[in-house]
Amino acid sequence: MTLRLRVEAIVEELLDELDRGGPPADFHATVAFPLPALVVCELLGVSAEDRADLCRWQVEAKQVSKPAVARGGLQSLWRYLGTLIERKRWAGDDDIISDLLDAAEPDPKLTDDEIAHLAAGLLFAGHAPVVAIIDRGMLLLLTHAEQREALRRDP
C-alpha cells in the first residue's frame, strides 16, 4: 500500500472518530493534533498497537512545566526507539528506520543512537507546524463558504 493510501486510511479513521463523538466536535483534538504523529509513526514503521503509547510519550516529553513528566516521557520514548531499531534490524520492513539500517550495512555510517535521534526529530519537528497548518486550513474552510463548496464538488 502506498504512503498516500496509508495516510488516507489514517485520516478516514480519525474523521470516523470525530463523527462518532457527535456535537460539539473537537477537530483539533480528534484530527489535527494526532494526525502528524500518526503519519510519522507510519513512516517509522511503528505498529498500530504501539502508536498510542508513542504519541503519549511525545506529548509528555514536551511538558516543560512538569520536568518529571517530561523526563519520564522522553525516557519511555527513547527506550521504545531503541527496541524498535533492534527489531527493525532483522525484519526487513519498508520504512525509514529499516532504510537507514540497510544503508548502514556493511559499514555502519549511522549508529543506533543517531538513528533514534533522527526518528525522534521527525516525531517532534514534524508535529507542531503540521498541526497548525491543519487547524488553519479548517478555519479557512469554515470561514470561506465558496472554498468549502469547491472542496465538496472536487475533493
Regions found by a protein language model. Give the residues of each.
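Cytochrome P450
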Residues: 1-155
